[in-house]
Amino acid sequence: SHLPFGGVQLLMIGDLQQLAPVVKQEEWEMLSKYYDTPFFFSSRALSETFYATIELEQTYRQTDADFLDILNKIRQNKADKATLEQLNKRYMPNFVPPADERYIQLTTHNILAQNINERKLAEIDADAFTYTAEIKGKFPEYSYPTDETLTLKAGAQVMFIKNDHSMDKRYYNGMIGEIVTIDEDGFVVRSKDYHEDIQVEREVWENSRYVLNEQTQEIREEVEGTFVQFPVRLAWAITIHKSQGLTF
């Protein structure tokens, strides 16, 4: 079909006031020949078709009206002095989280989160086990989903970083738990968000790129490399960047 999007009905969901699209340099070198920006509204197919815009107004993830107001002001770049004062009221420099409530400390930089996690792990009087990722092909270090060398102990607080795609749906990206048993082959995690202990298996991540066939003008996905590791990371602390999109 010569119709936009092949004549297929398309539903697009997103928020333009979130982070801009992430486009690799080599991909943009190709795409910039055809598009003015990496945003979807620069799509030529979109400009050739009629579309209806629907704005969702009901918020379900938050119920606190004051907090919602602060979030919306930040999102719209309208935060003022009163907004800052409201946030500062929540600042409690002497707060010590209860050990059994699994608080997560958000940090601005990876090294800060790493230092906190290493210190908390060292405080556990138990044997440490190390698991090394299996990396094949091209998989840049900045794209590693978790540590290449993952050191864990029984009693460590961990976060799952991938959804369980099996029928059981035992864990999801952002779920917090504690390692209850561990050996050189693997470990078991207990979480209040699942009804039984979870025997964790290694997962596979793919590093893909999209390649344009100049002759057919078709775009195909090409897997350049894979990363195989247990889908967890230490979770006493995590960077703000990595916390985006997670539920915990």
Predicted regions located by residue number:
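Conserved ATP-binding/catalytic motifs of P-loop helicase motor domains
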Residues: 1-248
